[in-house]
Amino acid sequence: KEFFDVSWLLGVAFEDDCRAVVTDDLDGDGRVDLLVTEYKTRGDWDAFRLKVLRNNFESDNHWIGVRLRDTAEGGSAIGARVTVEAGDRPLVGRIVTGDSFTAQHASVMHFGLGERERVESLTVEWADGRSVTIDGPEIDRYHNLATDAGH
């Protein structure tokens, strides 16, 4: 299999240096958007410009997401492991920070489910070892959990 660069077809081929990339579903519609900072040097000064690329592609595919919120009692969402049991293999993600140069992602996980219309469970394992599981969670929406969930 080969990969082809089609970024110019989608309007994401930038001529200048783009140093930070963050993905997030900015409008909560289940389609992940892209934020990019463009860096330009103009003589003796530097300029940064934020570009927001909204995902407006229509899709009948399903998804599920989780938004993790820090609490004073529960600590940080950073390091949490999120597992979605949906069919023959688990979908797993970890909340991290700093995985893109000069950028930080929100404490949000988004999982594409394709044509699957059901999820068996969604589990969050916090960095301190606590966990919380939602059995049969609703799809095509975000589930909000605080770090003190699972006490």
Question: What do the PLM-derived regions correspond to, one by one?
Answer:
Residues C18-V22:
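Signature of short aromatic-glycine-proline-rich micro-motifs recurring in repeat-based ectodomains
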